[in-house]
A protein has these predicted regions:
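Feature responds to low-complexity, polar/acidic, surface-exposed segments characteristic
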Residues: 2-40, 52-102, 109-130, 136-177
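Conserved dinucleotide-binding and phosphotransfer motif residues
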Residues: 49
């Protein structure tokens, strides 16, 4: 039952995160948001529980911006309550900045994300909907083995995400989130 509650909580939170990744949002306290956005409540909840905190010290959220792979690792580490402090000073990839390294390392250890090859994570790259969806679905227990993907992980991810309604109300394409 505990795992079911965790999965449902993760699914609901992830749906809110994915909606914001793609469509933007607004929340009280941010300088660059307006209350007319459909994602206001989701942003306020994620802000209140410490999962998302905005993009700078000036009080901006950047609702029309996109997330990088590094930033998504931070979101997932907070969402899953991973012990990222354990990974401070650990950097398994040559292209991950120090601020993101413990979050990326925790997500890699949990099996939520992986590098792009040759010792690189691609953390400064804009995360795609398929990549974000895969991280969420791995956290939910999907795609634990390589053979789960078939010949194309992106197609498998989008197909399964659609099947479980992960992308409901998310306006996206396979290129960017």
């Amino acid at each position: 039952m505990r795992n079911l509650k965790r999965a449902l909580s993760l699914l609901l939170s992830s749906t809110m995160v994915l909606g914001m990744v793609v469509m933007g949002g607004s929340a009280a306290g941010y300088q660059d948001v307006d209350a007319s956005n459909d994602n206001q409540e989701a942003i306020e909840v994620l802000q209140a529980v410490g999962i998302m905190s905005g993009v700078d010290d000036a009080g901006n959220f950047n609702p029309d911006g996109s997330l990088t792979r590094n930033e998504m690792a931070v979101v997932m580490a907070h969402l899953l309550n991973l012990d990222y402090d354990y990974y401070r000073g650990v950097n398994t990839f040559t292209d991950v900045p120090d601020w993101a390294a413990p979050y990326v390392a925790a997500c890699v250890a949990e099996g939520v994300t992986a590098g792009i090859g040759n010792g690189l994570y691609g953390g400064d790259q804009q995360i795609t909907a398929a990549q974000a969806g895969l991280m969420v679905m791995k956290a939910l227990g999907y795609f634990q083995n390589q053979e789960d993907f078939g010949s194309d992980w992106q197609v498998a991810t989008i197909r399964q995400a659609s099947y479980i309604n992960l992308f409901d109300k998310v306006n996206s394409n396979a290129e960017s989130a």
